[in-house]
């Protein structure tokens, strides 16, 4: 599943090619992804893309009409989605290529084998409505201090891994990145959130930020379907200390990495180094 790093990699790849350009055509081949697709071929042409930003795992596309009216797309890549840039004329679409948005001589194509993604046209700012208003802080939000993070952790007895995955305090903590950040901070993934000291909470927040920054620089994680906008794979999994390394030696102590299940997801950790 594309997580925060993969969505940010996508945003950074798309923005220079299409921001400031006008939509000239749209081709939708699939009537329904996670939700039915609106008539984007009638709604988008003539609109100029002013801004492309990320909020958690969503992309917010802000458009302006010739009359100055703002319109938005709120997109989510679901379990297997990705956006790809092509010069016009683009290669013929394949089975899982569901939508093309054309900006003159540049085409962006949405591909999603499992069809759990979404493309929603909106006439109101999506940042002011659900689901975005229920999201936790961005990892680099300046208001998310170590003190605030610690205070939020004190409100729940759930395991720290489950709390991070929920996205209610801070967004972006996908399964791979949770395992890696918890290892970097030396915190056991099953430890209750309210049993983490203030100092260790600060270390965890720092580790999470560094893990996500490293993942973005690596182009994200390609485990199955994700590719960047030019078709490139993300190589972060090659640098993982614990994720996907069950039975292999811990890079710190040399003892075997363990795997457990939490909420139906695999967690990788070192029982010797994480407490």
Residue ranges of predicted features:
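Basic, nucleic-acid-binding surfaces and adjacent catalytic neighborhoods in DNA/RNA-processing proteins
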Residues: 22-39, 43, 53, 60, ...
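A cross-family signal for N-terminal binding/gating loops and helix N-caps
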Residues: 1-111, 115-118, 245, 249, ...
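Phosphate/anion-contacting hairpin/loop surfaces
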Residues: 68-172, 177-184, 192
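Generic detection of long, well-ordered alpha-helical segments
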Residues: 1-4, 91, 139, 143, ...
């Amino acid at each position: 599943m594309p997580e925060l790093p993969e969505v940010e990699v996508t945003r950074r790849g798309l923005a220079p090619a299409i921001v400031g350009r006008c939509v000239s055509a749209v081709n939708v081949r699939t009537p329904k992804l996670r939700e039915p697709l609106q008539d984007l071929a009638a709604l988008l042409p003539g609109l100029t893309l002013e801004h492309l930003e990320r909020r958690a795992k969503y992309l917010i596309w802000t458009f302006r009409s010739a009359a100055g009216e703002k319109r938005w797309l709120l997109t989510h890549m679901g379990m297997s989605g990705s956006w790809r840039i092509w010069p016009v004329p683009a290669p013929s679409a394949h089975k899982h290529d569901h939508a093309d948005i054309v900006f003159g001589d540049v085409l962006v194509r949405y591909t999603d084998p499992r069809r759990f993604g979404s493309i929603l046209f909106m006439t109101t700012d999506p940042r002011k409505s659900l689901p975005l208003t229920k999201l936790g802080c961005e990892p680099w939000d300046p208001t998310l201090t170590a003190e605030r993070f610690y205070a939020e952790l004190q409100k729940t007895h759930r395991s720290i891994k489950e709390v991070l995955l929920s996205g209610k305090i801070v967004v972006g903590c996908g399964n791979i990145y949770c395992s890696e950040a918890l290892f970097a901070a030396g915190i056991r993934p099953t430890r209750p959130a309210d049993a983490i000291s203030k100092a260790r909470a600060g270390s965890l927040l720092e580790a999470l930020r560094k893990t996500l920054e490293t993942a973005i620089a690596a182009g994200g994680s390609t485990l199955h379907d994700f590719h960047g906008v030019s078709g490139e794979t993300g190589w972060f999994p090659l640098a993982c200390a614990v994720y996907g390394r069950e039975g292999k030696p811990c890079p710190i102590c040399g003892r075997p990495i363990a795997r457990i299940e939490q909420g139906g997801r695999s967690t990788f950790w070192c029982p010797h180094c994480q407490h």
